[in-house]
Amino acid sequence: MTLKIKSGYRLNVAMIVLNEDNKILFCKRRNTENWQFPQGGVDEDEHIETAMFRELNEEVGLEKDNVEIKAVSQNLIYYDIPKNIRSRVLGGKFKGQAQKYFLLKLISGEVDLNIENTPEFDKYSWVPFWYPSNQVVDFKKEAYR
């Protein structure tokens, strides 16, 4: 799948994972107080769904068989990284991200944040659907709505 992306943005996948109680997986970035959905970049020539499953496993230890895809955003959702932190985010190569969102239902398995030597998250919580848009870092708030 080839997606047309605005210049200066990195293609990214974000996963909204629902548990059996229809609560959403919300993760705290390691060494910060920032919370977000699992997300990550799409490698060059990588299929968007393949990237989503790779990032889901890398970040929260879930496999393809642990989830069911319920919906996928039709459009890319963009957010800008503030200029004062761009050099620290994504190596300063991008002005923001173009995200494709996946709504996933957890059907088996458990979240595992300690799946690699340098995990991106150090804590997670299952939260009501309205919670993330108020708690995410300011520059992502519009994308979460």
What are these regions (language model features)?
Residues 1-20, 91-92:
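Acidic, metal-coordinating catalytic segment for phosphate/diphosphate chemistry
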Residues 10, 37, 95-99:
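Short connector loops at helix/strand junctions that flank enzyme active sites
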Residues 17-20, 29, 104-106:
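Active-site beta-strand termini and strand-to-loop segments that position acidic
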Residues 32-33:
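A short acidic/small-residue loop/turn micro-motif
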Residues 42-138:
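Unchanged
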